[in-house]
Amino acid sequence: MKKSMILGLAALMGVLTSCGQKAGAEAELHVIFDNPAPRTMPLSLFGEVPAELVQELGIAEGVPSSVSAVLVEKGGQQWLFDAGNGNDDSRLLPKMEELGVAAQDIDAVFITHLHGDHIGGLVKDGKAVFAQARLYVPAVELDAWMQMSGGAPQNVKEMVEAYGGRLVKFAQGDALPGGVEAMAAYGHTPGHMVYRTDDKLIVGDIMHGVALQMGHPEYCARFDMDKEKAIASRKAIVELAKAKGWTMYGMHFPTTEGIAVK
């Protein structure tokens, strides 16, 4: 597979280093921007951020972001982590095709959580887009959304119906294909998971604005459903990645490169 075009990430605070694939790494990973144009998160989404900090970080016009999915090739298998928005201008499938991977080539899709910008690309006209794939969804997450007052969101119900018996609910600690490890990182949503393959940590929505939240994890985006848990998860995952030397890849990072914490 071709390597993704490297898009640089502005220096965040001196604690980050952008880094690409390690030579000889077993898993080949590609971050795919689903959004067709550069994207920022409005600063207002993060509450009241002191003007001095805004100036220091250079984020007055918004926090650089993206809507992304992650494609991994390992051991002859093709895995997708989340599936983007599924909008008409989605870049996920076209970019996969550029990399030589068709939707029907995907063996497994792993979902971090059930927000629309992560599952919107799973279903088209009521049918599964990844027709040969098993869909792995955290049980805590799916159960929480299915039991919400007023019923499950339509896109969640469509996902369940479209994938049918190929939808696999799992709990932390369950064996997943290829040795993929799922770790609970609750707070953004009730059952948000991050995934590890080799030394690569796919962190979902741990951070929506990495330029702000990496150094200041106490700031939550409006989308975090349980802010106290989200802050705790954000701190824990970053510290874990630092301690283990794992590279983080996030669905709202503004770079196709991973980020290693120094």
Q: Which residues make up each language-model segment?
A:
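Active-site neighborhood of phospho(di)ester-bond hydrolases with catalytic His/Asp-centered motifs
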Residues: L80-A83, D107-D117, Y136-P138, A184-G187, ...
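Active-site HxH/HxHxD metal-binding segment of metal-dependent hydrolases
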Residues: G84-Y163
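C-terminal motif of bacterial Sec signal peptides marking the signal peptidase cleavage site
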Residues: T17-S18
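Cap/insert and terminal regions of metallo-dependent hydrolase folds
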Residues: Q21, D199, V203-K262
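Positively charged n-region of N-terminal signal peptides that target proteins for export
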Residues: M1-S4
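Active-site environment of divalent metal-dependent phosphoester hydrolases
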Residues: R39-T40, L114-G121, T189-M193, H208-L212, ...
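Metallo-beta-lactamase
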Residues: R134-A184, K229-G245
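Conserved beta-strand hairpin/beta-sheet module of binuclear metal-dependent hydrolase folds
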Residues: G24-A27, F33-E98, V194-I206
